[in-house]
C-alpha cells in the first residue's frame, strides 16, 4: 500500500493555484491577482490570492493553506474520537469565483488533504474536494456540460464515483433552513483514503484540473450577454444564499475559524456585494422563477 507523500501533495496544490489564477486572469484581461502571504501563529500559513473589480469577475479568491498543530479542534474530533491526541497537518486549495455578469454562474472548487500522526501508530489520512456551480440564470446546456465534465473526471477511477459524489454534493450544498439547494451541484467527496494513496491522489489531481474544463467554457459562452439593473438585483439577492450557507452550514468555514485559521482567507468566499429582501418571490414564468422551478431541484443532468 502506497504511503502518503505530503510533499507531492503540496507541490501539486501550489501548481494548481498557479494554473487557475493564470487562467482566470487570461479570460478577464483587466484585473490581476494580488497575493497575500500569511503565517498562522499556531503553525503553518498560506498564500491568498484575490482578484477584484475585473472586466468579467467582480471578485475571485484562490487560496492555498497548509496548517499544522499538536491537537485538533473540536469540530474535527467530534465525529472522529480516534484523532484525539494526534498532531495534524491540513492543506488545500479553495476558490470561489463571483462574476460580474449575472448570466455567468458563481463557481466554487476545493481540493484538500488531511493527515494526523501519532508516535508508533499508522497515520490517519484522507483527501476531500469537489466543485459546484451556482447559476443566477439557468441554461440547461451549461449544467449538462458541467456535469459531463464531472462524470468524465470520475469514470476512469470508478464507475460509481460520479453518482456517489454527485449525490453527496447535492446533499451537502443544501440550505436546510430554506429547503433549497445552493446551486446545481457537481462533485463533493470527503474521507477518501481507499484503495491507496496513489489512487486517491491521482483522482484529486483530476478533480482539480477538471474544474477549469468545466467552468471556463460556460464563462466564454455567457460573458457577452447584455444585462441590466433587474438581472443585477436578482444576482445580488441570490448571492445572499451563498452567505447564508457559508456562515451557517459549511464545515470548512467552521473548521477554519475553530482551528485559529486566518479569518480574512476563510471568509474570502463571501460575495463583494449582497442584497437581502424580506419574503421575496419572483413573478411566475419569469427567468428568475425558472431558476427555482427548473434548476434548484434534485435532477440527474447526465
UniProtKB/Swiss-Prot annotation:
Substrate binds at residues 94, 110-112, 260-262. SUPFAM superfamilies: Coproporphyrinogen III oxidase (SSF102886). GO terms for cellular component: cytoplasm. It catalyses: coproporphyrinogen III + O2 + 2 H(+) = protoporphyrinogen IX + 2 CO2 + 2 H2O. It comes from the Bacteria. Its cofactor is a divalent metal cation. It is an enzyme of class 1 (oxidoreductase). The keyword ATP-binding does not apply. A divalent metal cation binds at residues 98, 108, 147, 177. It is found in: Cytoplasm. It holds the Pfam family Coprogen_oxidas. Keywords: Cytoplasm, Heme biosynthesis, Metal-binding, Oxidoreductase, Porphyrin biosynthesis. GO terms for molecular function: coproporphyrinogen oxidase activity; metal ion binding; protein homodimerization activity. GO terms for biological process: protoporphyrinogen IX biosynthetic process. Its EC number is 1.3.3.3. The record marks 177 as: Important for dimerization. Gene3D superfamilies: Coproporphyrinogen III oxidase, aerobic. The active site is at 108 (proton donor). Residues 242-277 are annotated as: Important for dimerization. Belongs to the aerobic coproporphyrinogen-III oxidase family. Homodimer. Involved in the heme biosynthesis. Catalyzes the aerobic oxidative decarboxylation of propionate groups of rings A and B of coproporphyrinogen-III to yield the vinyl groups in protoporphyrinogen-IX. This is Oxygen-dependent coproporphyrinogen-III oxidase.
